[in-house]
From Swiss-Prot:
InterPro entries with a match to the protein in the record: Glyco_hydro/deAcase_b/a-brl, LamB/YcsF/PxpA-like
Protein name: Lactam utilization protein lamB
CDD domains in the cross-refs: LamB_like
Name of the gene encoding the protein in the UniProt record: lamB
Disulfide partners: none
Pfam families membership: LamB_YcsF (PF03746)
Organism name: Emericella nidulans (strain FGSC A4 / ATCC 38163 / CBS 112.46 / NRRL 194 / M139)
């Protein structure tokens, strides 16, 4: 397939510490990214961490989005839960609203909403889950999601702007779905470079089964997601930035 048609950006999940427990070298990562998805207290984060993360993003001119997850701090939002559609809508409103308070205080605009972890995976697989979560997104705010899944369909059906994601540190299965591990596994920088370059240059990915899977993103804006809790995340994001910068320069973006 052909290269993507727009400038690629890098987004990263941030503010995923809790109390005295730290997660990820956020301050070291901020100069390397374009967009931050800030945890909103359900899978990680707390009021003080949210406030500090918003301030740090503002200082680095980073676009800020809400990163709502399932109410499961112990499992870091990576354990599936059964919630009603009403609950899914409500927890989204609650978490996005919490972040909005800190954004308003700092004069920072809410750029988007990007669901976290297993909730993201549930939305990819289940249209009703995707729809319920998206009903909790404020009017006029885009959603980040995986193209070709129920996230894209629900967003389009509800008139929500959809922005596509590729992944720098997550593998895909042969159906083009993400393989979400409870605990992140290390990546070799050479594998990260190959993984990201294939997605940008060919709109495809080599699955865990060795199958080349197309990932058509149409004309959506696109960013590469990396995670601050991945082992070696600093090298992963430096490698991703190298590939992204080379791609954008090559195609004049």
């Amino acid at each position: 397939m052909a290269p993507i048609k727009k400038k690629a950006l890098i987004n990263c999940d941030m503010g995923e510490a809790y109390g005295n427990w730290t997660c990820g070298p956020d301050l070291e990562l901020l100069p390397l990214i374009d967009i931050a998805n800030i945890a909103c207290g359900f899978h990680a984060g707390d009021p003080l961490i949210m406030m500090e993360t918003v301030r740090n993003c503002k200082a680095h001119n980073i676009l800020v989005g809400a990163h709502p997850g399932l109410p499961d701090i112990q499992g870091f939002g990576r354990r599936e839960m059964k919630l009603s559609p009403e609950e899914l809508t409500a927890i989204t409103i609650y978490q996005v609203g919490a972040l909005q308070g800190f954004l308003d205080r700092e004069g920072v605009r809410l750029n988007h909403v990007k669901p976290h972890g297993v909730l993201y995976g549930m939305m990819c697989r289940d249209y009703e889950v995707a729809k319920a979560v998206m009903l909790g997104i404020p009017k006029g705010i885009p959603v980040f999601g995986l193209p070709g899944t129920n996230m894209e369909k629900a967003a389009n059906d509800l008139g929500i702007e959809f922005r596509a994601e590729f992944y720098g540190d997550v593998k895909y299965d042969s159906n083009g779905m993400l393989v979400i591990d409870r605990k992140k596994k290390p990546w070799d920088p050479a594998d990260v470079e190959k993984h990201v370059r294939q997605q940008l240059e060919d709109q495809s990915v080599t699955s865990v089964d060795g199958v080349v899977v197309p990932l058509p993103i149409k004309d959506y804006d696109v960013s590469i997601c990396c995670h601050s809790d991945s082992p070696g995340c600093l090298e992963i994001i430096k490698t991703t930035k190298k590939v992204v910068d080379e791609f954008n320069k090559k195609y004049g973006f």
